[in-house]
Amino acid sequence: RVPELVFLNLDEAFGRTEGDEEIQDLLQGSRGLNLGLHFLSGALTFDPAVTKVGAELASRIVWLDAFLTNVDRTFRNTNMLMWHKELWLIDHGASLYFHYSWVNWQKHAVSPFVQVKDHVLLPEASGLEEADAEMKRLLTEEKIREIVALIPDDWLHWSESPGRPQEIREIYIRFLCERLAHSETFIKEAQDARKALI
């Protein structure tokens, strides 16, 4: 599960009274349209020593993070919450890290994603091949195109931009479709890393 996604506008006054300069810089850089997650009041940080996750769910989450190249769901920082006895995924900001350097995005699309070895749920993820089959059934090129089309143009204008918004969207689509078509590469990497753990 992922908390409800919402679009929100932050005006210039937001965060002016924040004492931490680094956070204030982040808030000032976030003026305008943002993507946020519904606040899960009373949620607790997921602790793998306290809460066990079944193999099917763990495998799906590991698959998703390997697909999106999310480097930030580790034992040190799980980026998961327990809320009403359910597991919720938060903070996907470290995903798709190829977009910090557009050079060789094609190479990144077919990479094995070696960072999966640090995934907090990897020890429980014994059903990766089944998760792969299920996710490929659900996540088609058409669905990827629908999702990427939702990205506002304003979010696709930056100084290091490789092109106009539609060109950038097309790179994201091609990246995700290539990743999906070559999922056996990151599945094998995850399986090998899991064998080394157990």
Annotate the PLM regions:
Residues 1-198:
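Phosphate/dinucleotide-binding and metal-coordinating scaffold of catalytic cores
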